[in-house]
């Protein structure tokens, strides 16, 4: 039986500076079978950042040019806000290049600086990927908000 595997990576940054002190929000959807069902995430700035991050993660009201892969529905159902933050950084690490099917490991983190966020995201990816795929984990996205570096 041939199984088609697709990794759903969705990353969109929607910037709405309606209030300079508004938090950034990160939403993630990672099913137990990330290898077969992929994963999704979204983040946004602004007063309604949580709603926007969830919408992006779920594939709702996507900005022009962003396409959600067909088999992302299970990951989308699991989308949840994992953090609101100001003057911090977040990172996503995966064991395959962006838009390539078949991830075994995905990690994410929010921290005071990019180095810490990236280190924690890599550790999460390596733990999920297991011994055979740990070395393939790499930070695929790292973003800082406000004064964080």
Language model: regions and residue ranges:
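N-terminal signal peptide c-region/cleavage motif recognized by signal peptidases
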Residues: 13, 18-20
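Secreted/extracellular ectodomain signature
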Residues: 21-149
